[in-house]
């Protein structure tokens, strides 16, 4: 495609300079660009602002350079955020024309040969013009081809439903609808968005005679606490009137033309990405047909939240090399392959590629490398507070960075295990099919179906084998009143989409859980060599804090053989001892590891969340309970904006904010035998303290202080997938006094590989153990099986590969002392 060539330019000597960081020599982090690089992150490219968040709004190659904009969380009238120009030798310049704000819009306007990015228009000679905030106030979120004069004009949308008609030559703007922030500035007391439901705008695109806009939030106090209320909107405008298309949270809107706009706007489809508390929603608008909908599973639930703040900007974007089309989609923590030919008649080809932990606002292919613009370190932490973090706060100054990878990076991150529902506490009508749910792309698949009604039903699963809209009967299952059922699928069951039909009116839950075969083992990647283990004491430890007030360094209060010493790590990764008692005292006070915020017993780690809910996580290697009790290891910290990283008993977990359902949706990432004293994000990197200096020699990921007495590990958060597959053991009951019919606490079982269960009791007669699962963490329990356990007997059960669920619990038929243990190998 010519348009791909226009944006990428020729791949020349610049491509050689931008070789992978994997080309580092064994003892240095300097790569072939001459810059230090840690797992694809160049510290010198990091950007800062003075607000509570510094996210990446857009990254676009233009005239051989990479153009990047950052945003503050709510600055509709400008800020100190910048437009950055990065040359192929990785020289970064903050353009003097920068006016900041909260921008994430970008479009290449081919007729005028300009890049529009944020409030800037950049011509073929790299001259930058500015759309002043006085003329176009608001948080710029999207641009779309003009409905009647696409050669000379462009449409701009703001997050608070402001819309402008802009002359691409003069940049004169006609206000179509006033931005909500501007209305409030002028004295308006109502909601920010009044044109349609929801607020917190995201996507904007045009075609088929309409402009389509999305928002993904709700402006209410309840939306800041409860994730499953009505929220968001997909709407379209015909040039005169607005029409609500669907009342759900939506983000990206695009089409085959991507950043350029559709080449055949009258007939090309429009795609939109959204979600609700059930699953991801994929919408498509086709000429002459209107809107159709499909559902996909969520790899991560950390993006949920009715306020819409946790998503940033998911995208569908061409990342193919010159002359190629390869669409990459990001949504709810998953990289997806998206087919450029996607229509309702040809819907095959969506495929999960890999799960990730970074928070990504935009991405592109630049000279053969994928570049992800991230939202890494937010000073405010917003609503993401919890007891297990203690008094720790965010960094002193918000900062983020770019993450460079290869075209294969999306395939080489985390496993694509995911879950989603088509029905969740829903009133289901007899004979009415559910939405289509993606079925192909995973090795191990199952469904959990529940009939919460007083009448029996038969559920018919139907499949669309080829993605052509032709449905056929696949399987029937009977679900009596008040019962639930585990429905495993075989790896050979082949279809693009699956849906369900009930024979009776019922209240039902139907959740699919899908997983690929685990290919990782328990051995960590050599990049982690030198982090202290349970068998080796650390030569240096320390607490870390990103410094405020434009110091742009990482403060480290280190513990060494010589005692306590304060260090600073700068943007060139030089670590020097400093005398700064004020900062050292601040770190000592605010960043101490909290005591007693979790309970480790002989079977599990017990966590009680902010809502009083009880959760149990597996144990790891012997020795971690002592480390936790002694406050030697950080338990919980935000290292990617608006979600936490939990570290317990040798396992790292992704932990959504409480407003995204928190511990209910926790996800294990990796297991290990390391004793990591502290972890933090800095300039886009993942940082660890707790280093065995002798073992660390020669590892380019280890940064030593100039005096050689302290050290830290530096990499990327998605390196954690290489630390070792999740393992663990334990259970919710260990010779525990139980009452008949009272369920145990939930115990995590999701995301592990080989899983075994052991049931026993101390009673003199037989006891029946009822085993239930919550497949997605949504609080709906399904019966997996009932096991009669004789006195003195231990019943062992290995879960089949098709079995997938997040939580498990057991209930006994008698009062007794019961044991329910699990081994995850």
Residue ranges and their predicted role:
Residues 67-100, 118-132, 166-167, 177, ...:
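Beta-propeller domains
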Residues 491-508, 800-816:
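Noncatalytic modules at the cell exterior or secretory-pathway interfaces
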Residues 29-52, 527-537:
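A short helix->beta-strand "capping" segment at the edge of beta-propeller domains
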Residues 270-272, 280, 296-343, 437-440, ...:
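Loop/turn-rich, solvent-exposed surfaces of beta-rich toroidal or solenoidal domains
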Residues 45-81, 100-107, 445, 537-560:
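Beta-strand-rich domains and repeat architectures in extracellular enzymes and scaffolds
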Residues 51-58, 98-112, 135-152, 181-208, ...:
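Repeated scaffold domains used in trafficking and secretory/extracellular systems
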Residues 81-88, 171, 224-240, 282-288, ...:
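Beta-propeller blade signature
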Residues 358, 362-425, 678-737, 748:
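Blade-level signature of beta-propeller repeat domains, shared across WD40, Kelch, NHL, RCC1
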């Amino acid at each position: 495609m010519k348009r791909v060539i226009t944006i990428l330019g020729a791949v020349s000597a610049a491509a050689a300079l931008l070789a992978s960081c994997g080309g580092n020599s064994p003892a240095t982090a300097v790569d072939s660009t001459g810059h230090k690089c840690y797992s694809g992150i160049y510290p010198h490219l990091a950007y800062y602002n003075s607000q509570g968040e510094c996210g990446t709004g857009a990254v676009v190659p233009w005239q051989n350079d990479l153009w990047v904009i950052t945003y503050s969380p709510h600055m509709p009238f400008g800020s100190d955020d910048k437009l950055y120009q990065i040359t192929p030798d990785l020289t970064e310049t903050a353009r003097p024309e920068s006016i900041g704000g909260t921008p994430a819009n970008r479009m290449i306007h081919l007729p005028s040969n300009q890049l529009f990015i944020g409030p800037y228009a950049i011509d073929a000679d790299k001259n930058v013009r500015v759309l002043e905030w006085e003329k176009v106030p608001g948080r710029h979120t999207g641009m779309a081809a003009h409905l009647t004069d696409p050669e000379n004009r462009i449409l701009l949308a703001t997050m608070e439903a402001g819309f402008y008609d802009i002359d691409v030559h003069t940049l004169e703007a006609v206000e179509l609808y006033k931005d909500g922030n501007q209305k409030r500035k002028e004295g308006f007391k109502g909601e920010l968005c009044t044109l349609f439901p929801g607020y917190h705008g995201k996507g904007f695109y045009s075609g088929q005679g309409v402009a389509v806009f999305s928002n993904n939030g709700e402006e209410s106090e309840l939306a800041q606490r409860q994730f499953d209320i009505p929220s968001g909107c997909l709407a379209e405008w015909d040039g005169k009137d607005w029409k609500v298309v669907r009342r759900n949270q939506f983000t990206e809107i695009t089409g085959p033309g991507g950043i350029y706009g559709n080449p055949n706007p009258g007939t090309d489809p429009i795609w939109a990405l959204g979600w609700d508390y059930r699953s991801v929603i994929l919408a498509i608008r086709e000429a002459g047909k209107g809107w159709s909908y499909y559902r996909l599973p969520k790899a991560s639930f950390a993006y949920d939240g009715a306020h819409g703040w946790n998503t940033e900007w998911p995208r569908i974007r061409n990342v193919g090399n010159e002359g190629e089309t390869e669409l990459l989609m990001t949504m709810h923590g998953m990289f997806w392959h998206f087919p450029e030919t996607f229509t309702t008649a040809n819907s095959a080809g969506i495929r999960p590629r890999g799960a990730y932990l970074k928070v990504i606002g935009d991405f592109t292919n630049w000279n053969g490398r994928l570049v992800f613009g991230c939202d890494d370190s937010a000073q405010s932490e917003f609503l993401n507070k919890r007891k297990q973090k203690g008094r720790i706060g965010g960094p002193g100054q918000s900062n983020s960075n770019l993450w460079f990878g290869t075209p294969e990076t999306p395939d080489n991150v985390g496993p694509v295990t995911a879950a989603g529902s088509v029905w969740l506490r829903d009133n289901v009508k007899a004979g009415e099919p559910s939405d289509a749910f993606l079925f192909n792309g995973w090795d191990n698949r199952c469904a959990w179906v529940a009939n919460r009604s007083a009448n029996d039903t038969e559920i018919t699963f139907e499949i669309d084998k080829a993605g052509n809209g032709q449905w056929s009967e696949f399987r029937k299952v009977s679900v009596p009143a008040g019962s639930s059922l585990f429905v495993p699928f075989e790896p050979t069951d082949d279809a693009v989409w699956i849906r369900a039909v009930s024979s009776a009116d019922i209240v039902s839950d139907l959740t699919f859980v899908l997983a690929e075969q685990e290919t990782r083992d328990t051995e960590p990647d050599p990049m982690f060599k030198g982090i202290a283990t349970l068998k080796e004491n650390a030569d240096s430890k320390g607490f870390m804090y990103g410094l405020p007030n434009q110091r742009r360094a990482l403060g480290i209060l280190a513990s060494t053989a010589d005692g306590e010493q304060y260090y600073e790590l700068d943007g060139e990764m030089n670590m020097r001892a400093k005398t700064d008692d004020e900062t050292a005292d601040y770190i000592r006070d605010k960043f101490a590891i909290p005591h007693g915020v979790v309970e480790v017993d002989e079977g599990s780690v017990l966590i009680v969340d902010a809502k009083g809910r009880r959760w149990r996580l597996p144990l790891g290697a012997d020795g971690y309970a002592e480390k936790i009790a002694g406050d030697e290891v950080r338990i919980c910290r935000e290292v990617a904006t608006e979600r936490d990283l939990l570290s317990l008993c040798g396992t790292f977990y992704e932990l959504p904010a409480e407003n995204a359902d928190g511990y209910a949706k926790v996800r294990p990432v990796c297991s290990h035998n390391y004793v990591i004293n502290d972890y933090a994000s800095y300039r886009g990197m993942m940082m660890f303290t707790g280093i065995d200096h002798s073992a660390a020699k020669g590892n380019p990921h280890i940064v030593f202080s100039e005096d050689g007495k302290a050290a830290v590990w530096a990499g990327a958060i998605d390196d954690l997938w290489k630390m070792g597959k999740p393992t663990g053991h334990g259970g919710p009951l260990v010779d525990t006094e139980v009452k008949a019919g009272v369920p145990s606490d939930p115990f995590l079982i999701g995301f592990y590989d080989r899983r075994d269960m052991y049931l026993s009791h101390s009673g003199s007669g037989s006891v029946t153990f009822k085993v239930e699962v919550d497949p997605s963490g949504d609080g709906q329990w399904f019966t997996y099986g009932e096991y009669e356990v004789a006195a003195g007997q231990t019943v062992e059960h290995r879960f089949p590969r098709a079995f997938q669920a997040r939580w498990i619990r057991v209930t006994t038929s008698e009062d007794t002392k019961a044991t329910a243990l699990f081994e995850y190998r």
